[in-house]
Amino acid sequence: MQDLHAIQLQLEEEMFNGGIRRFEADQQRQIAAGSESDTAWNRRLLSELIAPMAEGIQAYKEEYEGKKGRAPRALAFLQCVENEVAAYITMKVVMDMLNTDATLQAIAMSVAERIEDQVRFSKLEGHAAKYFEKVKKSLKASRTKSYRHAHNVAVVAEKSVAEKDADFDRWEAWPKETQLQIGTTLLEILEGSVFYNGEPVFMRAMRTYGGKTIYYLQTSESVGQWISAFKEHVAQLSPAYAPCVIPPRPWRTPFNGGFHTEKVASRIRLVKGNREHVRKLTQKQMPKVYKAINALQNTQWQINKDVLAVIEEVIRLDLGYGVPSFKPLIDKENKPANPVPVEFQHLRGRELKEMLSPEQWQQFINWKGECARLYTAETKRGSKSAAVVRMVGQARKYSAFESIYFVYAMDSRSRVYVQSSTLSPQSNDLGKALLRFTEGRPVNGVEALKWFCINGANLWGWDKKTFDVRVSNVLDEEFQDMCRDIAADPLTFTQWAKADAPYEFLAWCFEYAQYLDLVDEGRADEFRTHLPVHQDGSCSGIQHYSAMLRDEVGAKAVNLKPSDAPQDIYGAVAQVVIKKNALYMDADDATTFTSGSVTLSGTELRAMASAWDSIGITRSLTKKPVMTLPYGSTRLTCRESVIDYIVDLEEKEAQKAVAEGRTANKVHPFEDDRQDYLTPGAAYNYMTALIWPSISEVVKAPIVAMKMIRQLARFAAKRNEGLMYTLPTGFILEQKIMATEMLRVRTCLMGDIKMSLQVETDIVDEAAMMGAAAPNFVHGHDASHLILTVCELVDKGVTSIAVIHDSFGTHADNTLTLRVALKGQMVAMYIDGNALQKLLEEHEVRWMVDTGIEVPEQGEFDLNEIMDSEYVFA
């Protein structure tokens, strides 16, 4: 018999050591790449020490101002560089070379070369800003770590500009002796201005080699001790959290619960946040929160071995079903053929262009773009495939146990999170499919069978249809035969891979086939399901705002009002955008469209609208901007969502092309180097200008509510105070964001860094307070809804519960109980008064002041209608 307690202690030791190994591996990758300055400890040192060195450089400059006599040769050159930039470059080079046995002279020359490059390419950037920005963007996209490569690319760019523009002169290299003096001067300033505990951080030392005295740099002993302590401390901060094989310790205080060993448990509090504030969040203050979290921790899970067996074969055979392929999208052996004739492939830039015909040059440009897209997609593929391997490995490890458990904790808004780095009920499709409830429950009644069928329909992709249609489709004989085939041989009958949630659907297929077989044998009552049937909110944030403001329009859009079929708010916004775009497709020559710096009219406008029509204006395009609206999204974040949509289309086409052994097709006509109006920037601006106002045409409640909350946050900041209010669960949400002054140092080729400066820490940041207030408020309320719902389920005897913020799951036969709790708790939260009025009054009473802020009026929507809505959670 297994000693599960002893095993749990061993697992937590592995979690602790796993976090250390992960940290050390990350840092070692930086060192191996020659970028020791990018290790965690050196990044910290850089940010702290730039300021004193910059002051040292300024003192050096001031020393010779107004002095008679000849100034040092280095001075004139250092006047061309900002102090902070020179300090950053110097320390970054020193840190990269410190442990390479480089001599003091070699380090000095490298520093000077980087300083020269900064001056040189700053000149280029000032003369051809847009062009150089494209060069830097291209370098960033290539993800190169090689400074030499970046330097060579910039030199080619400089040459190209000089050949086109007679007013721009090519760079004349600084003499070597000048470089040595510049580098030596900066190293002397570094030694004399940067201290730690009264000792210089960097100091020169000497050693004899072959009869010669060689000077080199080293760090002081105290800094070495600090680095060692930093490594040990940071490495232990983030254990590789994993499931438990015995129930986690119940939370009794904000600091006592969760994992079983001190070294792991001490890294997690029940609630993230300021320790002084967290102390207030006791069981007495919020008993329902403790009750809900501990119930979630007691839910028994187990590995779904059927799904595990399939995904292991998918990985072994690299089939790519529902997961990234394990074959690189692009590498040295698998790269699109270079269209440039072999005899010209060694040429670069303008020299290459002169040797090619216009058609060949365009083919070359297209090839470069295709390779860049593939390399970007490959980076993501590699990361995702590695995550799959880690997840499957952990599932294999825990498949030996009958039951496993998860530790839960909360963020500062009381949102609930599983504390597991890989395998988790809050994971992606594969992660959720690899888990199932330990408890198996029957599907005997009509209601239980209905929800079991609806679960399969949802996972397949019929979640926008009525419940009756979903059930009917699942009971269709042809669909049943497909599910039986899949369960019998999922690697031959692969229709499951095309489902909306492939692996969760596969898990359901295994159970459905078993159920059908038992029905055929007249033993249906023996069937037991282990799968959670999830009930998801319809854009939860907008649901909460619409409920608290009793907004009829919003309530209908997000299914708070009863309807014959589920309402699709993302699709509704997409339809508004489609109509607007259609008008521009038929626009006359007099019609103009302006967004930011982009103005389109006539032919240009029609072409842009037609391009988007061919790409497809779908709910996928509008989903993220709509979904994030209640959480503080802006027009700028809307534009970022449009970019993400296009990038996602490109990545999917690239992956499909590799799987089919062909060149990827273009999914859109937008190109950076086009001379017309169909550039990516213009396309993103155009679509953003259509989507952003369309959202407010469909829903208004979030906008007026967020405006009022921001006003309250501004009022608090003007008083130099934060916000603090009590959620329906008793959780006290505190928001107090202090101003910090951060100076970002930017270089042309060596990246940038935020340096921390000594600032007053008692000033509230007004802009940050206003930006965070509305998202925190609505997150706090949807988290409260989750906690209150879980408490009701516990009271009704439900012990198997899955939650992911606005998604709730339990067994099919308990789903009706869950749905009643979900709807009832939503009504109870808002039926008694106005949540926004309570928020305002709580602060006015504490501040003893009338803020003058007006609370938005509530509408006519009857909250009790929620109880009759079939699709509010579906």
Swiss-Prot record:
EC id: 2.7.7.6
Gene3D superfamilies associated with the record: 1.10.287.260, 1.10.287.280, 5' to 3' exonuclease, C-terminal subdomain, DNA-directed RNA polymerase, N-terminal domain
A GO MF label: DNA binding
Matching SUPFAM superfamilies: DNA/RNA polymerases
Gene Ontology cellular-component terms listed: DNA-directed RNA polymerase complex
Catalytic site positions: D536, K623, D806
Pfam short name (any one): RNA_pol
Top-level taxon of origin: Viruses
Keyword Nucleotidyltransferase in record: yes
Broadest EC class assigned to this enzyme: transferase
PROSITE patterns xrefs: RNA_POL_PHAGE_1, RNA_POL_PHAGE_2
Coiled-coil region list: none
Catalytic activity: RNA(n) + a ribonucleoside 5'-triphosphate = RNA(n+1) + diphosphate
Keywords assigned by UniProt, alphabetized: DNA-directed RNA polymerase, Nucleotidyltransferase, Transcription, Transferase, Viral transcription
GO BP terms, alphabetized: DNA-templated transcription; viral transcription
Keyword check for Nuclease: no
UniProt similarity note: Belongs to the phage and mitochondrial RNA polymerase family.
Function comment: DNA-dependent RNA polymerase that catalyzes the transcription of viral genes.
Name of this protein: DNA-directed RNA polymerase
Organism: Enterobacteria phage SP6
